[in-house]
Regions:
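N-terminal entry segment of metal-dependent catalytic domains or homologous docking segments
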Residues: 1-33, 39, 46-49, 132-135
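Acidic loop->beta-strand submotif enriched in PP2C/PPM serine/threonine phosphatases
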Residues: 9-24, 81-84, 116-157, 193, ...
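Short beta-strand-to-coil "C-cap" segments at the C-terminal boundary of structured domains/repeats
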Residues: 205-211
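Active-site-proximal, acidic helix/loop segment immediately C-terminal to a metal-coordinating Asp/Glu
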Residues: 35-57, 139, 143-193, 211
């Protein structure tokens, strides 16, 4: 994971997590709190910590999302909300499930092409009931999953422009190490940004088929 705060001297308003369960599931998650600074950081951190607790307790991802939404709603007087971007990967069969609440597109880098994963939903903490949109995909050997916050995609001009940049500029680099990949994308976003920067987070994870 690589991240940068939008405002100098203030905490990054994004939060992220990577968990691997004994049940053979890897969970990646990124949350973007409203605005920047300490308030945004508190919102995104709360969402991620709740997700981690529910995941460890064995709750379904759909129920966890509903409970996180309810928790943020209890603080609605303070106009708190946060995006939630979740990817769960079954490490036995490579099945990946993406769940998004207000989050920008995720990307799967596969060989020389980029697959975009979209969803149209509001962030957590706005409506009493959230519509959980799921996208299921079967991963292939060597796939790289990228979860980003809008500070990254906005720097490149949008989600489609980000996908194009990934294909043209990122894939030719041939990064095997996910951390190197995340660092490269973050640095490039900082160089491309033409307006006041937002908090920026890149979470990268690569999955290989286990050799028997």
């Amino acid at each position: 994971t690589a991240f940068a705060a939008g405002e100098m001297g203030k905490p990054c308003g994004d939060a992220s997590s990577f968990l691997e369960s004994e049940r053979g599931t890897a969970l990646l998650a990124v949350s973007d709190g409203m605005g920047t600074g300490e308030k945004a950081a508190a919102e995104s951190k709360a969402a991620i910590e709740l997700l981690e607790q529910f995941a460890v307790a064995g709750f379904s991802r759909e129920l966890a999302v509903q409970l996180i939404n309810s928790a943020l709603l209890l603080r609605r007087a303070e106009e708190n909300y946060a995006t939630l971007d979740i990817c769960s990967v079954d490490l036995y069969d490579g099945q990946a499930e993406f769940i998004k609440l207000g989050a920008v597109a995720s990307f799967i880098c596969r060989g020389n092409r980029v697959i975009s994963v979209y969803a149209h939903s509001l962030p957590a903490g706005i409506l009493e009931q959230v519509r959980v949109e799921k996208n299921d995909m079967r991963l292939k050997d060597g796939d790289l999953i990228l979860l980003l916050t809008d500070g990254i995609t906005d720097a490149f001009g949008g989600e489609r422009q980000t996908a194009q940049w990934l294909e043209e500029k990122f894939l030719p680099q041939g990064f095997a190490n996910p951390q190197d990949a995340a660092d490269f994308i973050l640095q490039a976003a900082q160089e491309h940004c033409q307006k006041e920067p937002d908090d920026r987070t890149v979470q990268a994870a690569r999955f290989w088929k286990k050799i028997a």
